[in-house]
Amino acid sequence: AYRFPGEINIIAIGPLTNIANVINKNPNIVKIIKSITIMGGSWFSGGNISPVAEANIYNDPEAAEIVFKSKIPITMIGLDVTHKVFLTASHIKYLASLKNNSGKFLQDISNFYVEFYKETKNMNGCYFHDATAAIAFTNPEYFDFKKGKVFVSQDRLTRGQTVVFESEKFHETFIDDKRGNINIANKVQSKKVINKFLEIAEKYMK
């Protein structure tokens, strides 16, 4: 990061442990990271590992709290949008039909999730969490965002819940905190996200 100050953009698609560790060891690094796009959290959509928590944040809420209050420019791509982007079994079958090994690989690694959603939710496909976050970075115009401050609960019953104070509704003094405002995705043009992924698959997976 120090070789390319202000040029590092991070797309985080798992728990934020490693990023929090770096911040703890070298707090000045927050000044040279350009942005972090986080696949994690939830505003109004509840949780997917508990009634209130999304899995990536739940697995290390202490780390998530460190990252969210770091003042690094952050975009949160949570369940409010990823649960609206659905990769169908037909999409996965199409990927497997592409004349390259990558398409078959994507089918193989998706089968577990397809079976899981079929058994637990009677759905024919799977949510498209991680790739949605990546596309939010490359094509933010597919999303609507609100600004707010995000706090992460570490209490037993609400562990991992992301509590959002929307900037337009809550004055900073009300929450008595100096953390930066975060861009929180609250709407998505899901068809455009899927089509962009398929376009990339067709073009680059060779």
Task: Label every PLM stretch briefly.
Residues Y58, I77-K206:
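Conformational coupling and interaction surfaces
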Residues A1-K84, A89:
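Active-site histidine-anchored catalytic micro-motif
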